[in-house]
C-alpha cells in the first residue's frame, strides 16, 4: 500500500504526450493493481492516462469500464466499455459485458441493441453466445416470442453455457405458467372471508393468521353486544377496532397479491441475470 501511495503521488499529473512505451508500462502497472484488487487506485491512475494512440485509448477505456464493473458501478462501466472501438481486440468482450451491465440496471432495450449490432460467423461459439444473451434479454423483457426464436438455436454444444441454455428454458416456462393473482379478487375474497385473499395470493400462513385475528375480534364484539347492548362503550370501541382490522385485512390481501407478483418477477430476473453472467466469465476468462 505504501508503494501504491508513492506512485499515486508520483503520477499526479496526466500522462498525455508520453510515448507509447511509457503508456504501456503505466497500463501494465494498472493491471497489476487490478490483480491485487486495488480498484480505487487503478481507477485514479486511469483517469490520468490520455494516450494519443487509438489502441491504447481503447485499452484505457476498457480498463476503466472493467474496474467500474468490478465495483458494481454498472451504468458507468457500460459507458466506457461502449467507447472501445471495433478495431480493438477487446471490442467483443467490451460489447458483451456492456450489454450485460445495461441489462442488469434495467436498460433492456439498449442492451438488446448492443447485442443486435454485433455480427459473427454462423455456428461459431461467440455467435451462439450472442444468441444466448439475446434470449436472456428477451426473457427479462418478458418478450416470449423473441425468446422462442432465439431458444430454437439452443443446441447445448458449448460447455461454457450449455446448462444455462437449459435453465433459461425452465425460467421461460415458469414465467409463462405463473398464476396471475389479481389484487381486486384478493380484496373481494377477504371481504367475504377474512384472510382468504391472502391464501389466494399464496400467503397461506398470513391468511390463516388474519382469519383467526379478525374472527376473534368479531366474536369479542358480538359478545359485548349480546351481554351489554349496542349502546355500551365497550361494544362501540370493540366494533371500531374490529372494523379497522377488517378493512385492513381487505387492503392487506390486495397488497399481498401485488407483492407476490413483484417478488416472483424479481426472483426470476435475478436468476436470469445470474445465468447470463456465468457464460461471459467462462467464455472471456
Question: Language-model features: where?
Answer:
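Sec-dependent N-terminal signal peptides
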Residues: 3-13
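Hydrophobic alpha-helical membrane segments
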Residues: 59, 93-100, 107, 170-285
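Alpha-helical protein-protein interaction scaffolds
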Residues: 20-174
Amino acid at each position: 500500500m505504501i508503494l501504491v501511495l508513492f506512485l499515486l503521488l508520483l503520477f499526479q499529473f496526466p500522462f498525455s504526450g508520453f510515448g507509447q512505451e511509457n503508456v504501456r508500462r503505466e497500463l501494465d502497472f494498472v493491471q497489476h493493481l487490478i490483480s491485487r484488487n486495488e480498484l480505487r487506485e487503478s481507477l485514479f491512475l486511469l483517469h490520468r492516462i490520455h494516450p494519443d494512440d487509438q489502441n491504447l485509448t481503447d485499452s484505457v477505456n476498457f480498463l476503466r469500464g472493467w474496474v467500474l464493473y468490478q465495483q458494481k458501478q454498472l451504468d458507468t462501466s457500460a459507458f466506457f466499455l461502449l467507447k472501445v472501438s471495433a478495431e480493438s481486440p477487446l471490442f467483443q468482450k467490451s460489447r458483451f459485458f456492456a450489454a450485460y451491465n445495461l441489462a442488469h440496471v434495467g436498460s433492456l432495450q439498449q442492451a438488446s441493441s448492443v447485442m443486435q449490432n454485433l455480427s459473427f460467423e454462423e455456428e461459431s461459439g461467440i455467435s451462439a453466445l450472442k444468441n444466448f444473451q439475446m434470449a436472456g434479454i428477451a426473457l427479462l423483457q418478458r418478450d416470449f416470442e423473441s425468446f422462442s426464436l432465439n431458444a430454437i438455436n439452443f443446441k447445448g454444444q458449448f460447455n461454457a453455457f450449455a446448462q444455462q441454455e437449459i435453465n433459461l428454458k425452465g425460467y421461460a416456462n415458469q414465467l409463462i405458467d405463473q398464476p396471475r393473482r389479481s389484487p381486486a379478487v384478493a380484496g373481494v375474497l377477504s371481504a367475504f372471508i377474512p384472510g382468504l385473499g391472502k391464501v389466494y395470493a399464496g400467503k397461506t400462513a398470513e391468511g390463516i393468521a388474519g382469519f383467526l385475528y379478525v374472527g376473534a375480534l368479531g366474536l369479542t364484539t358480538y359478545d359485548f353486544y349480546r351481554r351489554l347492548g349496542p349502546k355500551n362503550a365497550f361494544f362501540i370501541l370493540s366494533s371500531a377496532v374490529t372494523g379497522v382490522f377488517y378493512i385492513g385485512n381487505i387492503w392487506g390481501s390486495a397488497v399481498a397479491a401485488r407483492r407476490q407478483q413483484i417478488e416472483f418477477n424479481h426472483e426470476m430476473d435475478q436468476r436470469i441475470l445470474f445465468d447470463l453472467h456465468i457464460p461471459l466469465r467462462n467464455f472471456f476468462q
